[in-house]
Amino acid sequence: MEDGVYEPPDLTPEERMELENIRRRKQELLVEIQRLREELSEAMSEVEGLEANEGSKTLQRNRKMAMGRKKFNMDPKKGIQFLVENELLQNTPEEIARFLYKGEGLNKTAIGDYLGEREELNLAVLHAFVDLHEFTDLNLVQALRQFLWSFRLPGEAQKIDRMMEAFAQRYCLCNPGVFQSTDTCYVLSFAVIMLNTSLHNPNVRDKPGLERFVAMNRGINEGGDLPEELLRNLYDSIRNEPFKIPEDDGNDLTHTFFNPDREGWLLKLGGRVKTWKRRWFILTDNCLYYFEYTTDKEPRGIIPLENLSIREVDDPRKPNCFELYIPNNKGQLIKACKTEADGRVVEGNHMVYRISAPTQEEKDEWIKSIQAAVSVDPFYEMLAARKKRISVKKKQEQP
C-alpha cells in the first residue's frame, strides 16, 4: 500500500504500469470535472444575469408603453410621436392603425380625434383602421354597431364626414351590389344614426315610425328607392337595440365644465313666469349651461346652440341685454331642458332666451363667444349636401 492506496503484491511490472496510468487518468478526469463544474456555474450566473437584464428591459418597455398610452389619451399626436421615438411603434399607417384598433388602454374619444385629423398620415391611418374592420355579410346596422364601438365620433362636421365616407367605401367594398354607390351608403348610414337618436333620446318626443323612415330615404339609391324590406330590417334593429356608444372617463360633466369657453353670472328672464333670475352660466361644447350656484355639480338648464342665432336687444327693465332665438321662427320653442325643483327634467318653454349681462363689456364678450360656438347641426348639413349630389347625378344621367 502506497500513500494509502492499496496495491496487490502479485502484480507484474506491466500490470503495475497500467494501474498507474489508470490512477493518473482518474486524477485528470477529476480535475476536468471540477473545471467543468466551475464553467457551468459561471455560465449559469451569466444566464441568470441575462434573464434579469431581459426582465428589466421588458419592465422598462411596459412602463414606457403605459406612459405612451397616457400621453395619447391627453394628446393623441404627441402620444404617437412618443411611442415612435421610443421604438414601441412603427411609424407606418398600418402599424398605428393596428395599435388604435386593438385599443388597449386607449381613450376612444382620443382615437376618434386622431382618426379625424386631416393631415396626410392621419388620413392614411384612418383608411388602414377602417380596413381592419370586416363588414362582409353584415347588414348596415350591424356594420355601424361594430364601427362606432371602436372609437367615439368627434363633434366636428368635417371629421365626421371623412370618417363616414371611409366607412361607406369599406362597407360597399365588403358587400358589393347592396347599394348602387357609396353616396347611398353614406346617406343611409347618417339616416340610421339620426334614427337611433330620435328613437332613444328621452328629450325627443316625436318618435319617427317606419313609414316616415322609409319616406325620408326615398330616392337616395342613385335616384331610385331602396327595398322597403331592407329599410324595415334596419328600422327594427335600431328600435329594438340602440347603438352602444363608447363612454370614456373624460366625458362626464365634471370634465365638460373643466375648461369652458366662457363662464360668469348673468340674469335670465323666465319662460312662463317673466321674472329675472341670477344664474351662473357656462359656455362649452356648443351648449350654454346655467346653474343656481357655482358649486352645483348638475346644471339647472341646458341650451344647445345648434341652429340658434344671437342678437342685441333693448329692454326697459334691464341693461346690456341679448337674446338667443331661432331664425325664421314660426312659433316653435327652442329645444332645451331644465331641472324643476322636485328633480324632474322638463323641456324649456322659451321661444327666445333673453339674458342680461352686468356690463356692456361683458355683454359684448358673451355675444362674441356665443357667436363662435353657435353651430348648425352637421348631420343635416352633410346629408343635404350628399342628397343634392345624388339628385344632380341622377339628372345628368337622364336623356
Swiss-Prot record:
GO molecular function annotation: guanyl-nucleotide exchange factor activity; inositol 1,4,5 trisphosphate binding; lipid binding
Coiled coil feature spans: 13-56
Every SEC7 domain range: 54-241
Location of this chain's protein in the cell: Cell membrane; Cytoplasm; Cell projection; Cell projection, Growth cone
GO biological process: regulation of ARF protein signal transduction
Residue segments, region C-terminal autoinhibitory region: 386-394
Positions annotated to bind a 1,2-diacyl-sn-glycero-3-phospho-(1D-myo-inositol-3,4,5-trisphosphate): 268-275, 279, 290, 300, 338, 349-350
Keyword Oxidoreductase: no
Keyword RNA-binding: no
Domain of life: Eukaryota
Membrane topology annotation: Peripheral membrane protein
Residue ranges annotated for the PH domain, each copy included: 259-375
CDD domains per the UniProt record, alphabetical: PH_GRP1-like (cd01252), Sec7 (cd00171)
Record's GO cellular component terms: cytoplasm; growth cone; plasma membrane
Alphabetized Pfam families for the sequence: PH, Sec7
Keywords: Cell membrane, Cell projection, Coiled coil, Cytoplasm, Guanine-nucleotide releasing factor, Lipid-binding, Membrane
Subunit structure, as described in the record: Heteromer. Composed of GRASP, CYTH2 and at least one GRM1. Interacts with ARRB1. Interacts with ARL4D; the interaction is direct. Directly interacts with CCDC120 through the coiled coil domain; this interaction stabilizes CCDC120, possibly by preventing its ubiquitination, and is required for neurite growth in neuroblastoma cells. Interacts (via N-terminal domain) with INAVA (via N-terminal domain).
Protein role: Acts as a guanine-nucleotide exchange factor (GEF). Promotes guanine-nucleotide exchange on ARF1, ARF3 and ARF6. Promotes the activation of ARF factors through replacement of GDP with GTP. The cell membrane form, in association with ARL4 proteins, recruits ARF6 to the plasma membrane. Involved in neurite growth.
Domain commentary: Binds via its PH domain to the inositol head group of phosphatidylinositol 3,4,5-trisphosphate. The PH domain is necessary and sufficient for plasma membrane relocalization.
Name this polypeptide is given: Cytohesin-2
Species this chain originates from: Chlorocebus aethiops
Phylogenetic lineage: Eukaryota, Metazoa, Chordata, Craniata, Vertebrata
